[in-house]
């Protein structure tokens, strides 16, 4: 009898456990929270900007922290810089001291090292010259677009945006990073901002791998071109 009651109790517990909804995993909760669409509040609010926005109507323009937008860099396709510098310093000095007599007499002493007699005459001459030339030329081209995130909304309505993109290739990785400040009025209806409209822009394009290592000088070359090198 006791064994039969135990079997019924175990079966009831299994049935109750099957009726309980499964607990979502942390990944599921995170995805639901990230992919949740923003709701339109009925209470009107005004964004501190030159153009007021009411939350009664949903807008696709990214104006709040965490929203994303695209920043094409087609308008800044090429930049170049060149610098030349040259310096030359020359100095020549010569000194002659000749005394024919000392207190009315002409000293004449034999030179113990040979080569004639010692006298009161002395002379010095020296030349020094320094010359340096330097030339630097730099050019780059960057074309494409990157999606950035609104990192911060300032009290005046401007947005701080930053994002980076990593491209993994079979010979290394390439990094494209852009950060800067954007006005809310410069955001187009398709959520794009030209790179020429980004204030305090910091654009980084670098990479890792064999190609990036090939463009760097070796450790011995870096030693000889160091600013601490005296020559």
Swiss-Prot record:
The keyword Signal applies. Residues 69-82 have a biased composition (Low complexity). Keywords: Bacterial flagellum, Cell outer membrane, Lipoprotein, Membrane, Palmitate, Signal. PROSITE patterns: PROKAR_LIPOPROTEIN. Residues 46-90, 103-140 are annotated as: Disordered. A lipid is attached at residue 19 (S-diacylglycerol cysteine). A lipid is attached at residue 19 (N-palmitoyl cysteine). Disulfide bonds: none annotated. The keyword Transcription regulation does not apply. Residues 1-18 form the signal peptide. GO terms for biological process: bacterial-type flagellum-dependent cell motility. One of its GO terms (molecular function) is cytoskeletal motor activity. Residues 47-62, 103-112 have a biased composition (Polar residues). GO terms for cellular component: bacterial-type flagellum basal body, distal rod, L ring; cell outer membrane. It is a lipid-anchor. InterPro entries: Flag_Lring. It holds the Pfam family FlgH. It is found in: Cell outer membrane; Bacterial flagellum basal body. The basal body constitutes a major portion of the flagellar organelle and consists of four rings (L,P,S, and M) mounted on a central rod. Belongs to the FlgH family. Assembles around the rod to form the L-ring and probably protects the motor/basal body from shearing forces during rotation. PANTHER family: FLAGELLAR L-RING PROTEIN. This is Flagellar L-ring protein. The gene is flgH.
């Amino acid at each position: 009898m006791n064994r039969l009651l135990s079997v019924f109790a175990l079966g009831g517990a299994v049935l109750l456990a099957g009726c309980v909804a499964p607990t979502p995993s942390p990944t599921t909760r995170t995805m639901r929270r990230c992919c949740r669409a923003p709701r339109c509040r009925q209470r009107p609010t005004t964004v501190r900007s030159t153009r007021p926005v009411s939350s009664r109507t949903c807008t696709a323009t990214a104006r709040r922290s965490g929203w994303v937008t695209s920043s094409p860099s087609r308008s800044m396709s090429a930049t170049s810089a060149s610098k030349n510098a040259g310096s030359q310093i020359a100095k020549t000095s010569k000194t002659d001291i000749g005394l024919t007599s000392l207190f009315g007499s002409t000293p004449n002493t034999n030179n113990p090292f040979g080569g004639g007699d010692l006298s009161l005459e002395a002379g010095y001459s020296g030349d020094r010259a320094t010359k340096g030339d330097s030339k630097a030329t730099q050019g780059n081209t960057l074309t494409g677009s990157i999606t950035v995130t609104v990192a911060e909304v300032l009290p005046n309505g401007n947005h701080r945006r930053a994002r980076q993109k990593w491209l993994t290739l079979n010979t290394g990785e390439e990094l494209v990073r852009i950060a800067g400040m954007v006005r809310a009025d410069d955001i187009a209806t398709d959520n794009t901002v030209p790179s020429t409209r980004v204030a305090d822009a910091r654009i980084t394009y670098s990479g890792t791998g064999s190609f990036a290592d090939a463009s760097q000088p070796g450790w011995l070359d870096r030693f000889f071109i160091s600013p601490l090198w005296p020559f």
